[in-house]
Amino acid sequence: MKSTLLGLATAILTAAGSAHAQDSSSGNAEAGAAVFKRCMACHQIGPDAKNGVGPVLNGVVGRAAGMYPDYSYSAANKDSGLTWDEPTLTTYLRAPRKLVPGTKMTFAGLSKDQDIADVIAYLKQFNAQGQKVSP
């Protein structure tokens, strides 16, 4: 009987923890704009964005890796076969060189899950032309 109650309590706490983890992973675009300032040394976003050290990030969410026009991507990035969906971006932003060994991106990654979710929410606001669109 005690083991049944213990198992039930464990299941309830695990479910509650999972629900909380899902809630905390939803991103806030406004907070993401602040996190994105760390990316601006290499990347631009918006209607007047231009490639620099890194490619323009307009419309990046949903785009195939290594495909923004007029940017010289590493072979590793071009040949990765990745699509920048939310799960892939989450993994990449946590440790870029781990997901794509040989990438030109020198940034080590974001350590906080909420920062990653927030910056993805920020990126999702911009279409391929750099216009803000409704999420």
Language model features by range: what are they?
Residues 29-33, 47-86, 104-107:
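Gly/Gly-Pro-rich "capping" loops immediately C-terminal to redox-active cysteine motifs
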Residues 1-4:
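Positively charged n-region of N-terminal signal peptides that target proteins for export
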Residues 38-41:
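Short, cysteine/histidine-rich loop/knuckle motifs that typically chelate Zn2+
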